């Protein structure tokens, strides 16, 4: 079963497009199209494998015929990394450490 988080998807809509910078009200959480990310027939990838993309960029990556598949995958990965960065840097996502975890052991 794939990870789902409606709140995360809603928060990403506040982001500018992580490819072109558009803030035109069309930005959504564009899921990965890769099987390795949980994508299947009629099944979206995990909600943590998303990129904030506007309608135009999302369309170009999902159905674009002007780019090779490898180029579309590379652009999506870049937008995904930027989206995760935006979530943390904007303060919309933060880690809350569990109590009593102790210090991480160094290898």
Locations of regions flagged by a protein language model:
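Short cysteine-rich loop/turn motifs with clustered Cys
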Residues: 2-30
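Detector for the c-type heme attachment site
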Residues: 21-22, 57-60
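Short recognition patches in nucleic-acid-associated and regulatory proteins
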Residues: 25-41
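Polybasic, low-complexity binding patches
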Residues: 38-48, 59-107
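Active-site cofactor/substrate anionic-group-binding motifs, chiefly glycine-
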Residues: 51
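Zinc-coordinating Cys/His ligand positions in small cysteine/histidine-rich zinc-finger domains
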Residues: 54
